[in-house]
Amino acid sequence: MGPAGSLLGSGQMQITLWGSLAAVAIFFVITFLIFLCSSCDREKKPRQHSGDHENLMNVPSDKEMFSRSVTSLATDAPASSEQNGALTNGDILSEDSTLTCMQHYEEVQTSASDLLDSQDSTGKPKCHQSRELPRIPPESAVDTMLTARSVDGDQGLGMEGPYEVLKDSSSQENMVEDCLYETVKEIKEVAAAAHLEKGHSGKAKSTSASKELPGPQTEGKAEFAEYASVDRNKKCRQSVNVESILGNSCDPEEEAPPPVPVKLLDENENLQEKEGGEAEESATDTTSETNKRFSSLSYKSREEDPTLTEEEISAMYSSVNKPGQLVNKSGQSLTVPESTYTSIQGDPQRSPSSCNDLYATVKDFEKTPNSTLPPAGRPSEEPEPDYEAIQTLNREEEKATLGTNGHHGLVPKENDYESISDLQQGRDITRL
């Protein structure tokens, strides 16, 4: 029993060892498979996301969709997300959906005339649309009335389409501006028509005619008739006529400009002092008349005055009348005494010792204190003693020069810049 028990014990030990090894191996295999599966899942998920991202990038944005022209036939039509529903993260566009989008945009890419034909008379599209076109909200009661009539079935003004509404509103604003300017014209016309009965009657007729409207228009636009009653053509014609009438009526009332005075150029106008007998006065009168005639003729031609002679015409251009010589009509020269012009008195005679006023000599300095004293015989009530002192200075210098000339002869004029010897000689002369 001993060896048999030992064999059983050794067999159990081997079985447990092999079982534990097999369990460990199976555990490692299972963990390895799990790792592989997880790696496969990680690789598959980015590939799926990248495919969705590429599909989303291929779809054009809303900006590209609106920037593409509807009438261009050469561009490829993008897939519309609004027509086919919103795109989700996992959806992939199939070929059937792209074909339907292509067909839809091929139908849309038509000419402008086909688009206009697709709308009925009320402005509503014939084909069914998934979304409605944007409409401008009514800003006034006039717009609400127009929209209400279009819904009821009446065809309103400018309701052919959504874009025509914009045109109608802009034209209506222009009409309002025209009304503002034309009211100013009407005020001017009323002020002018108070003086002109004809213009007033014509204005009344034009305004009454402009306010008349056809039956359906007056019924539909009774509340805002002030905008519809403006007839710009009639108003323009009326304003032009009134302005022409006012211009014709105001022309005779305007005063004519004053005539330009003709100035007769006479060289002998300033000859006021006349010396001589009656013969000289008559001679000057005749010469002044001839000069006036010549000066007045200088503005005329032979066409204006056919009585002109050749001498007078030549005198206009070639003769120069000097103040000392006057010409008669016959051509004789008359001498006028020159005493009429006052001659300028010459400078008082200077002393021989003073050559220049800028540089004073020794003689001048020595004589100024003695000469500035007023003489005894001169009256003391003279108003300007300074000027009189200068005159007495000149007189005393002349007397001194005459005395020195009588005794010592003429004294030579001194230079502006004197030497020492000349200065000493000058002192000796002044002492004598």
Curated annotation (Swiss-Prot):
Top-level division of the source organism's lineage: Eukaryota
Tissues with expression: Ubiquitously expressed. Present in germinal center B-cells, plasma cells, T-cells, monocytes and platelets (at protein level).
One of the protein's GO biological processes: regulation of T cell activation
Region (Interaction with NHERF1): 430-432
PTM entry text: Palmitoylated. Phosphorylated by FYN on Tyr-317 in resting T-cells; which promotes interaction with CSK. Dephosphorylated by PTPRC/CD45 upon TCR activation; which leads to CSK dissociation. May also be dephosphorylated by PTPN11. Hyperphosphorylated in mast cells upon FCER1 activation. Phosphorylated by LYN.
Pfam families linked to this entry: PAG (PF15347)
Residues modified as Phosphotyrosine: Y105, Y163, Y181, Y227, Y317, Y359, Y387, Y417
Disordered: annotated span: 110-137, 197-230, 244-432
Gene Ontology CC terms, in alphabetical order: membrane raft; plasma membrane
Phenotypic consequence of Y181F: No effect on interaction with FYN or CSK
Main subcellular localisation: membrane
Polar residues composition bias: residue spans: 110-122, 316-356
Assigned keywords, A-Z: Adaptive immunity, Cell membrane, Immunity, Lipoprotein, Membrane, Palmitate, Phosphoprotein, Signal-anchor, Transmembrane, Transmembrane helix
Composition skew (Basic and acidic residues), residue ranges: 220-230
Transmembrane segments: 17-37
Residues with lipidation of kind S-palmitoyl cysteine: C37, C40
Known partners and oligomeric status: Interacts with FYN. When phosphorylated, interacts with CSK. Interacts with NHERF1/EBP50. In resting T-cells, part of a PAG1-NHERF1-MSN complex which is disrupted upon TCR activation. Interacts with LYN on plasma membrane lipid rafts. Identified in a complex with LYN and STAT3.
Protein name: Phosphoprotein associated with glycosphingolipid-enriched microdomains 1
Native organism taxonomy: Eukaryota, Metazoa, Chordata, Craniata, Vertebrata
